[in-house]
C-alpha cells in the first residue's frame, strides 16, 4: 500500500473512533443506582422520611405504595401514568375497574411537594412511586430492595391497555402467568409478587361471587363464616368500605403466612386458590410457605424486574410539576 493509502486508512480510523466517541457521549443515561446523587442528593432520604411519617399517621398507606408499583409498572411502562387524573377526553387509569380500591394518591403529592422544596423540577413522579413502594414494603416487614432510579414521567394515561396487561382476579392461572411473562417475570417471580396479598384487604365486590348464591366448595369451611360476616350482601355497594383482611393472622406484616393460608384453602380470590393448586405454581407455593428467606429473595428480584419495565429515560417523557397532571395540563 502506498503512502497515500496508509494516510487514508489512518484518517478513516480516526474518523470512526471520533464518531464512536460522540455516540457514547450522546447516549442518553438509563436507570442507575443513586441517579440523583449530584442533582438531589437527599432525594431518597426525603422519600424514606415522608413514607415513615405517612405510615405512622395512616398504616394503610403502605399497602397503597405496594399496589401502586404493580398497577403502574405492569402496564407497558413504569412511567407514573397511573397517577394522572382523568381529562375530558381520557379516563385516567386509576378510574378503571381494574384499579378498584386504589387510593391514597394524595400522599404521593405530599412526597412530591417535599422534594420540590428541596430540588425543584428534578425528581420524577415515577421514581417517587417506585421508591415509596420500596419504603412501604420495608415498613410492613418486607425486605429492603435496592432499586435504580432515573425514570421520567409519561405524558398520557394508558387506560386502553389496562386489561391487556393487568390480570383480573377471575382469570385462569395460565393467563396470569402469560401476562407476567410478557414483562419478564417468571413463575417464581409471579408466585412471590402475589405474596403481597399477605397484607391489606380484599373488597367484598371482588369476592362475593365465591359466597353467593352458593359458597364455593373449594373454600375452607372454617373460614367461610368470617367471610360471610364481613360481606353480608350478595351485591355490595361499591362505595361502601366492606372488605376482608387478606391474612387474619398477620394482616399488617408482609410474610410467608399467605402461602400457608392458600394451601389451607383460605385464599380470598380465585387466583389465590389456583396459585396453591396448579401444578406449575404449587411446588413454589409450598417452598415459600416453609422458607420466608426464599420468598423474600424471589420477591426482591420480581420487584426489581417490575420497577425496570420499559422506563422512560434521558430526554423521553418529562418531569411533572404535579404528579396527577401532565405539564401541558398544568
From Swiss-Prot:
<dbReference type="GO" id="GO:0140825">
    <property type="term" value="F:lactoperoxidase activity"/>
</dbReference>
<feature type="binding site">
    <location>
        <position position="79"/>
    </location>
    <ligand>
        <name>Ca(2+) 1</name>
    </ligand>
</feature>
<dbReference type="GO" id="GO:0009505">
    <property type="term" value="C:plant-type cell wall"/>
</dbReference>
<feature type="site" description="Transition state stabilizer">
    <location>
        <position position="67"/>
    </location>
</feature>
<feature type="signal peptide">
    <location>
        <begin position="1"/>
        <end position="23"/>
    </location>
</feature>
<comment type="function">
    <text>Removal of H(2)O(2), oxidation of toxic reductants, biosynthesis and degradation of lignin, suberization, auxin catabolism, response to environmental stresses such as wounding, pathogen attack and oxidative stress. These functions might be dependent on each isozyme/isoform in each plant tissue.</text>
</comment>
<feature type="glycosylation site" description="N-linked (GlcNAc...) asparagine">
    <location>
        <position position="170"/>
    </location>
</feature>
<dbReference type="InterPro" id="IPR000823">
    <property type="entry name" value="Peroxidase_pln"/>
</dbReference>
<feature type="binding site">
    <location>
        <position position="81"/>
    </location>
    <ligand>
        <name>Ca(2+) 1</name>
    </ligand>
</feature>
<feature type="binding site">
    <location>
        <position position="198"/>
    </location>
    <ligand>
        <name>Ca(2+) 2</name>
    </ligand>
</feature>
<keyword id="KW-0090">Biological rhythms</keyword>
<keyword id="KW-0408">Iron</keyword>
<feature type="disulfide bond">
    <location>
        <begin position="125"/>
        <end position="323"/>
    </location>
</feature>
<keyword id="KW-1015">Disulfide bond</keyword>
<comment type="similarity">
    <text>Belongs to the peroxidase family. Classical plant (class III) peroxidase subfamily.</text>
</comment>
<feature type="binding site">
    <location>
        <position position="167"/>
    </location>
    <ligand>
        <name>substrate</name>
    </ligand>
</feature>
<keyword id="KW-0106">Calcium</keyword>
<keyword id="KW-0560">Oxidoreductase</keyword>
<dbReference type="GO" id="GO:0046872">
    <property type="term" value="F:metal ion binding"/>
</dbReference>
<keyword id="KW-0732">Signal</keyword>
<protein>
    <recommendedName>
        <fullName>Peroxidase 42</fullName>
        <ecNumber>1.11.1.7</ecNumber>
    </recommendedName>
</protein>
<dbReference type="GO" id="GO:0048511">
    <property type="term" value="P:rhythmic process"/>
</dbReference>
<keyword id="KW-0479">Metal-binding</keyword>
<feature type="binding site">
    <location>
        <position position="255"/>
    </location>
    <ligand>
        <name>Ca(2+) 2</name>
    </ligand>
</feature>
<feature type="binding site">
    <location>
        <position position="250"/>
    </location>
    <ligand>
        <name>Ca(2+) 2</name>
    </ligand>
</feature>
<dbReference type="GO" id="GO:0042744">
    <property type="term" value="P:hydrogen peroxide catabolic process"/>
</dbReference>
<feature type="binding site">
    <location>
        <position position="72"/>
    </location>
    <ligand>
        <name>Ca(2+) 1</name>
    </ligand>
</feature>
<feature type="binding site">
    <location>
        <position position="247"/>
    </location>
    <ligand>
        <name>Ca(2+) 2</name>
    </ligand>
</feature>
<keyword id="KW-0349">Heme</keyword>
<dbReference type="InterPro" id="IPR010255">
    <property type="entry name" value="Haem_peroxidase_sf"/>
</dbReference>
<feature type="disulfide bond">
    <location>
        <begin position="204"/>
        <end position="231"/>
    </location>
</feature>
<feature type="active site" description="Proton acceptor">
    <location>
        <position position="71"/>
    </location>
</feature>
<dbReference type="GO" id="GO:0020037">
    <property type="term" value="F:heme binding"/>
</dbReference>
<dbReference type="GO" id="GO:0006979">
    <property type="term" value="P:response to oxidative stress"/>
</dbReference>
<dbReference type="InterPro" id="IPR033905">
    <property type="entry name" value="Secretory_peroxidase"/>
</dbReference>
<comment type="function">
    <text>Might function as heat shock-like defense protein.</text>
</comment>
<keyword id="KW-0325">Glycoprotein</keyword>
<dbReference type="GO" id="GO:0005576">
    <property type="term" value="C:extracellular region"/>
</dbReference>
<feature type="disulfide bond">
    <location>
        <begin position="40"/>
        <end position="119"/>
    </location>
</feature>
<dbReference type="InterPro" id="IPR002016">
    <property type="entry name" value="Haem_peroxidase"/>
</dbReference>
<keyword id="KW-0376">Hydrogen peroxide</keyword>
<feature type="binding site" description="axial binding residue">
    <location>
        <position position="197"/>
    </location>
    <ligand>
        <name>heme b</name>
    </ligand>
</feature>
Amino acid at each position: 500500500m502506498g503512502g497515500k493509502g496508509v494516510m487514508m486508512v489512518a484518517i478513516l480510523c480516526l474518523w470512526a473512533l471520533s464518531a464512536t466517541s460522540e455516540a457514547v457521549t450522546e447516549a442518553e443515561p438509563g436507570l442507575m443506582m443513586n441517579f440523583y446523587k449530584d442533582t438531589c442528593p437527599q432525594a431518597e432520604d426525603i422519600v424514606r422520611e415522608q413514607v415513615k411519617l405517612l405510615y405512622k399517621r395512616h398504616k394503610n398507606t403502605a399497602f397503597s405504595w405496594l399496589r401502586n408499583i404493580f398497577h403502574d409498572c405492569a402496564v407497558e411502562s413504569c412511567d407514573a401514568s397511573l397517577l394522572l387524573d382523568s381529562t375530558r377526553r381520557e379516563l385516567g387509569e386509576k378510574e378503571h375497574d381494574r384499579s378498584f380500591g386504589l387510593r391514597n394518591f394524595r400522599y404521593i403529592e405530599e412526597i412530591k411537594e417535599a422534594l420540590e422544596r428541596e430540588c425543584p423540577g428534578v425528581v420524577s413522579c415515577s421514581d417517587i412511586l417506585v421508591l415509596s413502594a420500596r419504603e412501604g414494603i420495608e415498613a410492613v416487614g418486607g425486605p429492603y430492595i435496592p432499586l435504580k432510579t432515573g425514570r421520567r414521567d409519561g405524558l398520557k394515561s394508558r387506560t386502553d391497555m389496562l386489561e391487556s396487561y393487568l390480570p383480573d382476579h377471575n382469570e385462569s392461572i395460565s393467563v396470569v402467568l402469560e401476562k407476567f411473562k410478557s414483562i419478564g417475570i417468571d413463575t417464581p417471580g409471579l408466585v412471590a409478587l402475589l405474596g403481597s396479598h399477605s397484607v391489606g384487604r380484599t373488597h367484598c365486590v371482588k369476592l362475593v361471587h365465591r359466597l353467593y348464591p352458593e359458597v364455593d366448595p373449594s373454600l375452607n369451611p372454617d373460614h367461610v363464616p368470617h367471610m360471610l360476616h364481613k360481606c353480608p350482601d350478595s351485591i355490595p355497594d361499591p362505595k361502601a368500605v366492606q372488605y376482608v383482611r387478606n391474612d387474619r393472622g398477620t394482616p399488617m406484616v408482609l410474610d410467608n403466612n399467605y402461602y400457608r393460608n392458600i394451601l389451607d384453602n383460605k385464599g380470598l380470590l380465585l387466583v389465590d386458590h389456583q396459585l396453591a393448586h396448579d401444578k406449575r405454581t404449587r411446588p413454589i407455593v409450598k417452598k415459600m410457605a416453609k422458607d420466608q428467606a426464599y420468598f423474600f429473595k424471589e420477591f426482591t428480584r420480581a420487584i426489581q424486574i417490575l420497577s425496570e419495565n420499559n422506563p422512560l429515560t434521558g430526554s423521553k417523557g418529562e418531569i411533572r410539576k404535579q404528579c396527577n397532571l401532565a405539564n401541558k395540563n398544568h
